[in-house]
């Protein structure tokens, strides 16, 4: 995963604009998009 300067986490396999956010190879990763915290289970 790539950690952004604002603390956001971007991982390979992330799909924006859909209902599903998939993190490939990052079992414990959390994605922060704006005010949303999305874990791998969403």
Swiss-Prot record:
Record GO cellular component, one term: cytoskeleton
Cytoplasm among keywords: yes
RNA-binding is among the record's keywords: no
Subcellular location as annotated: Cytoplasm, Cytoskeleton
GO molecular function: actin binding
Role description: Binds to actin and affects the structure of the cytoskeleton. At high concentrations, profilin prevents the polymerization of actin, whereas it enhances it at low concentrations.
Name of this protein: Profilin
């Amino acid at each position: 995963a790539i950690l952004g300067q604002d603390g956001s986490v971007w991982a390979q396999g992330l799909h924006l604009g859909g209902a599903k956010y998939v993190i490939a190879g990052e079992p414990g990763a959390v994605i922060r998009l704006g005010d949303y915290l999305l874990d791998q289970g969403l």
